[in-house]
């Protein structure tokens, strides 16, 4: 808004100039805006020129424009500052990232340098340790070699009493035990262990004591054997080079007996060539002197002689080259010092601490011509004071010597000991051709019992004890790995094959089902449903049931067809011979009663039908089909006859309705016709009689009727009975049955009937009310219905069921006494309607319907109608 005071006080000239400038500026700005917006500037200029703007308005516009410019400039400056800040931040981040990368590289370099220095130091330490170990090992080897050389140089003298020998013995024991265990053992057992008991010039006695031998492993023995180079500076004393080889097994435990002149030598194969002096043949005394003189010469020669330790030479090659030592038999005075004696002693373990030398299996030690020790199987020590060596002793020694490498080789295989066999072949020089040419044939002794290899001994479990069970043998065979020794595997297979493995057979126990069935068939008449057979180990229970049901069904169909065929034949015969049948049935029981017995006999033996072959069953089924066709034809014929009879009855009833005046005379004739027709219908089935009797239900309503109760045990009538009809109690009065008259008979068959039976007519529905109480009393459809008496009902037909004795015994095979409703007859007709012969016939006649198999579910029922013997009169 413009300020009025400011406009009034300002001068006109200054105001006009300023106004013009402002107008020009505004126009320029407006034109620029129009150019920007695309609006025509001329129209706008005309309009503005027409309306001159006010000064206050122009001032405000300028202020706003200037403020806007300032704001825009500030914004541009702020944006520029922001861009600068962002650039600076980016530069700083780059610099920081570069610094971090440099630090990482530097750290990695430092870590690598540290690792390298650590590896270098570890390598230096390892090398130093290895060098120290090698130095220690070399020092140990050098000490052992020095000890060996020192001990070999000690033996310079020979004594008849064996003092030097003892020193040499103990020294060699110390020499050969190069480990710390041997040094400890030497400290525990000094050299003074072997002492002379009696030092006499003629006899030398020794005290044998047990020496604890260290247990060496094969690696220790090999390492010590490789660097052990024994020198041959030991002189030959009295023909015997006392270099004995001993085999130390890895499994050696306990104490080892040491003979006085036996050494334990670890190198497995040592071949030493010893030059022998010329042969001396002098007296015993001169021989002893010469022997003492030649000891120094021999030792000097041995120092110059080359000693070879042949580790790579196999055992068999050494034995082949020197199979037999050359020993010359001399006189008792002379001794051949150049003879090569090979001593191979096998040291075994003796657990007993006794001082017997039995633990040595072989040992031959010759000390001198004076003292000769022959350690044979019994290791007997023979010390002779004479100055002669027996040739027999030499022979025994050589035999034992040749035998020892063989057993050493056998034991090295079995006990996994050092592979090299200890063998020392002391070869004589070729200066004595006579000794080389002469060879003594040595006989190898039989191996003693203690040196039979362990795998040849039969196990105590296989020989001494009772033989194990084959199941345990199979289990051990599965658990144990196969033995590498072939003999043990053969022995195990022999012991396992010597027993026959008898597997346990699961014998199925089949019970005596025939006996059980025979006992159950005695009550087959009482129980209509037969139990199934027991399991005869057939494939499955369902298959057995199906097969059994099919077989029984086939047997049932066959029996049914047979019975129908018999019934048809009987009906034909009875129709043909009606008067004869009437005469016979007055005196005899009908033959049809035997048919149920036949059915029962067939039911008693179902195993016969079950055991019949399939071909017989097929033939029976074919016969049954043909019989079914015949039975259908006969059923159609019977149906036609029944229709004719029904028409006849209807005509009679119509006549009775029409002529009630002459009812009595007509009824007599009708009754006679009824009796004849009933006899014709009876064989075809008892159903037609019930159908005929049901026709009279419509007439039963016209006259009062009575209900008669029969006792179950006896056929007597209960007089004192109260009957309730819909809540009303009525006393039933019964007269003597002798004066009662038969008014009708009726029976009810089962609801289940095959399709061959005739269909009921409409008239049967009238009697359905009388049957309902019987169905409620007995649910089983297979019942035998007996019409015992004829009853008059006072009101609606009512039925009372009573159980007989058979029902008490078996509820399934019950016979129900049925008093069916009967048509009402005139009182005049009842007095003379039925003749006496007819009542007798009806009393004895049992009319059988279709034969029924009570045990089969498809069986139908047959009814038996029994009538009273005399006519019965009932009160009206």
UniProtKB/Swiss-Prot annotation:
GO CC, alphabetical: cytoplasm; spindle
MF terms in GO: microtubule binding; tubulin binding
Predominant location: cytoplasm
Tissue: High expression in lung, skeletal muscle, brain, and kidney, with much weaker expression in spleen, small intestine, liver, and heart.
Chain intervals with Basic residues compositional bias: 750-763
Function of the molecule: Promotes the assembly and stability of microtubules.
Family: Belongs to the MAP7 family.
Protein name: MAP7 domain-containing protein 3
Gene name linked to the record: Map7d3
